[in-house]
């Protein structure tokens, strides 16, 4: 009797275990499908404790198979194979097809993103708030060690009508890649944004998932980046201020090199190397080490690093003296920021403030360096998606204030280019002139002689020509394939409608001519399609309904980045669509972009 009881007891245990196994399997495998279509972070752990880890797209279900059963109906067997999340890390692996359009809603979101933000919001939302970025530092930087007693930083991020996902990815990149003891706080300054998700939804997210170290400051009217940063600095209590734009992603060990330089000399202001995040694909890529300069139109520009700056004992890790800063990303001692006069509060919104603070740093006893071992990615947009509240030309207004306070007699160099501005009003500058006297600042001639001797001067102030460092341009990308581009359904070739050298010309399908070199395409390692070694196949990022055209190769990917899929599709990365024959049986041979569906009209083959 006892053995029977034991046997049935064991059967019961086995049945119960099997039941729980099935229930847990169902729960963990299908819970994602039941999530609503909004941001639903799943908690994980990081250097600052629990944090939201996983992200579900807010407006579109995106390319995941489990969320898009219609993919099978569309016969797309290889949809975003590389878009997977590591179950341990919760980080999305980047795919060139992350921006693929699957339906009209995706198309609307993509087009709206370019209109509102001037970058691909569809990809931004699909990426979520966490992702790995490539470590773009020089190998020597990875061998450096930093003192344990570095000062803690307040990170100030001003934003106006920023994409929600881009803003939170900026914030989470700082949290994910900064030691907790070095991150005193993050201050978000909302410059009176119009978008609803940047109001209550942002507050709710911060309170729920980022309590403690995040402060959200709300401006009651549009102040602009300049005064917005001053407001953020006024609320900061960390020893060091770090200013970041609202569409950045910091890299590995980004903060320690900046803090170490400031710890060594509190009058040193430092900038990271700014890596490139493509506005079209959000791909993160390394930038060369360059330094800031300017021209007499008072516009910032990038300069090659002079040989005199490259021969230091520290080698590739040595700080690089920079005459100016780009302005979006820099760090300085908080007390020194206030001692030096913060920003010119008479400047409006944006423009010129980076040159003004650069001149003031150098002329008033400070130093400005770029730190090669610190890297931060930044979305470089082709246009500003918003203007000034009243439509005023803030760049001109701010440049005039800068010229009259800091350039001394050299302001005539500016007015020689803009004589129309000599009598234009620029407001009261007496406070800034008095600040210059109080700080005992040097002359602008001293700045040109000692900080930026490479700057050329015309007229009576002309000085001997400085050595010019010639940039011979990038090396041509490696050719991967060369041949005719066949449309498999029609057995025709993609060619120029007119001359292959005609910039802006359309491409069409015509009968293949094996003796015609003008039908030869090159596909290179930059994923460019180059016809007859002359022009690249290009798409408009903002008007995806436009047909592809031949344009000068710009080497920046995006609108000229094409990939060949497993189903012989030809996918355009920035548009998120595939190339198709409009009327395969017709005579015109027109081609256009369309949602990728695996149909025969979208099948291509590049010979070679």
From Swiss-Prot:
Annotated positions binding substrate: 191, 222, 246, 350, 381, 386
GO biological process: cilium assembly; determination of left/right symmetry; Notch receptor processing; Notch signaling involved in heart development; O-glycan processing; protein O-linked glycosylation; protein O-linked glycosylation via threonine; regulation of Notch signaling pathway
Phosphoserine: residues bearing it: 95
Annotated residues for binding of Mn(2+): 245, 247, 378
Positions in the Lumenal compartment: 30-608
Disulphide bond pairs: 141-373, 364-441, 493-512, 536-553, 578-596
SMART domains assigned to the protein according to its UniProt record, in alphabetical order: RICIN (SM00458)
Pathway: Protein modification; protein glycosylation
EC number: 2.4.1.41
Membrane topology (UniProt): Single-pass type II membrane protein
Subcellular location per the Swiss-Prot or TrEMBL entry: Golgi apparatus membrane
Domain of life: Eukaryota
Cofactor: Mn(2+)
GO cellular component: Golgi apparatus; Golgi membrane
Domain notes: There are two conserved domains in the glycosyltransferase region: the N-terminal domain (domain A, also called GT1 motif), which is probably involved in manganese coordination and substrate binding and the C-terminal domain (domain B, also called Gal/GalNAc-T motif), which is probably involved in catalytic reaction and UDP-Gal binding.
Subunit structure: Interacts with NOTCH1.
Pathological association: Defects in GALNT11 may be a cause of heterotaxy, a congenital heart disease resulting from abnormalities in left-right (LR) body patterning.
Protein name, UniProt field: Polypeptide N-acetylgalactosaminyltransferase 11
Protein's gene: GALNT11
């Amino acid at each position: 009797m006892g053995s029977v009881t034991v046997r049935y007891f064991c059967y019961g245990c086995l049945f119960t275990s099997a039941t729980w196994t099935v229930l847990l399997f169902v729960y963990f495998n299908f819970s994602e499908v039941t999530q609503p279509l909004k941001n639903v972070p799943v908690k994980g752990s990081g250097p600052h404790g629990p944090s939201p880890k996983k992200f579900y797209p807010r407006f579109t279900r995106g390319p995941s198979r489990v969320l898009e059963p219609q993919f099978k109906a569309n016969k797309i067997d290889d949809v975003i194979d590389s878009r997977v999340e590591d179950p341990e890390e919760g980080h999305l692996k980047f795919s060139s097809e992350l921006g693929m359009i699957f339906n009209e809603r995706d198309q609307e979101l993509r087009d709206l993103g370019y209109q509102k933000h001037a970058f691909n919001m569809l990809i931004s939302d699909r990426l979520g708030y966490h992702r790995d970025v490539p470590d773009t530092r020089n190998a020597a930087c990875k061998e450096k060690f930093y003192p344990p007693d570095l000062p803690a930083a307040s990170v100030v991020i001003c934003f106006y009508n920023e994409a929600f996902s881009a803003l939170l990815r900026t914030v989470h990149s700082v949290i994910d890649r900064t030691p907790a003891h070095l991150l005193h706080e993050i201050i978000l300054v909302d410059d009176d944004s119009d978008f609803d998700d940047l109001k209550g939804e942002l507050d709710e997210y911060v309170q729920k998932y980022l309590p403690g170290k995040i402060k959200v400051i709300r401006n009651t009217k549009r102040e602009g980046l300049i005064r917005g940063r001053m407001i953020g600095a006024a609320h900061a209590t960390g020893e060091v201020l770090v200013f970041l734009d609202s569409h950045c992603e910091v890299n590995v060990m980004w903060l320690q090199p900046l803090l170490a330089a400031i710890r060594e000399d509190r009058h040193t202001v430092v900038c990271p190397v700014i890596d490139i995040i493509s506005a079209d694909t959000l791909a993160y890529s390394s930038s060369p080490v360059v330094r800031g300069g300017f021209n007499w139109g008072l516009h910032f520009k990038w300069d090659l690093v002079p040989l005199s700056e490259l021969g230091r004992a520290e080698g590739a890790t040595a700080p690089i003296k920079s005459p100016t800063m780009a302005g979006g990303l820099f760090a300085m001692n908080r007390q020194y920021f206030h001692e030096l006069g913060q920003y010119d509060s008479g400047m409006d919104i944006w423009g010129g403030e980076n040159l003004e603070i650069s001149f003031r740093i150098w002329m008033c006893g400070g130093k400005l360096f770029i730190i090669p071992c610190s890297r931060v990615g930044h979305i470089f947009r082709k246009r500003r998606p918003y203007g000034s509240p009243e439509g005023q030309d803030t760049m001109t207004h701010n440049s005039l204030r800068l010229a009259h306070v800091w350039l001394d007699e050299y302001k005539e160099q500016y007015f020689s280019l803009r004589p129309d501005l000599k009598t234009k009003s620029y407001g009261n500058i007496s406070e800034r002139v008095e600040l210059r006297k109080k700080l005992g600042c040097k002359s602008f001639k001293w700045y040109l002689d000692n900080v930026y001797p490479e700057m050329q001067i015309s007229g009576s102030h002309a000085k001997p020509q400085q050595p010019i460092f010639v940039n011979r341009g990038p090396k041509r990308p490696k050719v991967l394939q060369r041949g005719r581009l066949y449309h498999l359904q029609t057995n025709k070739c993609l060619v120029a409608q007119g001359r292959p050298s005609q910039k802006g010309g359309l491409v069409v399908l015509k009968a293949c001519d094996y003796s015609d070199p003008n039908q030869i395409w090159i596909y290179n390692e930059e994923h460019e399609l180059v016809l007859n070694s002359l022009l690249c196949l290009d798409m408009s990022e903002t008007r995806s309904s436009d047909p592809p055209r031949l344009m000068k190769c710009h080497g920046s990917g995006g609108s000229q980045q094409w990939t060949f899929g497993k189903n012989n599709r030809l996918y355009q990365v920035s548009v998120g669509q595939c190339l198709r024959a409009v009327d395969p049986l017709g005579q015109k041979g027109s081609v256009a972009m369309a949602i990728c569906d695996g149909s025969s009209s979208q099948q291509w083959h590049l010979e070679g």
